[in-house]
Amino acid sequence: HVNASGMVNYKDFLKDKAELDTYLKTLSDNPPQPSWTSNEQKAYWINAYNAFTVSLILMHYPVKSIKDIAGKIYKINTAWDIQFINIGGKKYDLNNIEHGMLRRKFNDPRIHFAIVCASMSCAKLRREAYLPAKLDAQLDEAGKDFLNDKPKNRISGGKAKRRERGAG
């Protein structure tokens, strides 16, 4: 339910929500292990982040913006702070995965181009999972795609301008 431009058709995704739920359960029941390689762990967390982001939108569908979700939940500042993710018996929110697991543990700036925040300003959702064996190539490609996306990155008067996260 992702087109070639990385746009997600959430309405159609709802029809196959059972498949997504099965995938999320597989992720939840099989957390990364210390014996896994760095690329195996990184791919796992990127895929988990993206799948749970789609799931969050579907839980609140129809929703105009991911930013509208947090306002529905008492004492939650943003959608990224909702602890709805269970991995290996531990609760996470999207911020935990993005900042606590991905950015802190792997220190790879290309992660920014791989994780989706369900808005026009963010990286596009790939039509395939991130795989350990080709993760570096996938991350490089995601970075090139993002940086070459003119609506997301504009240079005006010699200054770079980016859309804000969660914008449009």
Question: What positions do the PLM features span?
Answer:
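Interaction/scaffold regions that mediate signaling and macromolecular assembly across diverse proteins
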Residues: 1-168
